[in-house]
Amino acid sequence: MTHPEDEDAVAQMRSRLAELDIELARPELASRPTALRRAWREHARLRHVVTVADRCHELCYDLQAARELTEEDPSFADEVQRLEEELDRRRRDLTELLAPSDPLDVEDAIVEILSG
């Protein structure tokens, strides 16, 4: 990742994800379907963000290793380029995922369509 505030945001999401894991393990949550559904949705969203952030870290490590290998063997240049492109894509994805979303996006909606 590139920005410290992104690192902080992902760290907070990891913490919240751990809290949700504990909350979702409680049997009494099953008796409250709305709260259960909301918790699972938040868990899925946070898990996705954390997974993308983890992949960015892996790609940074792999890219550094590939660059070192390229110094010894130029045939790794293609791998460096591939990793740079994937890292750029993942960073854009992460930036998009970290952008504030509309809280109403996760609410169910009833749409009535009338002809006439």
Task: Annotate each predicted stretch with a short phrase.
Residues M1-A109:
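Charged, heptad-repeat coiled-coil alpha-helices that serve as long linker/dimerization "arms"
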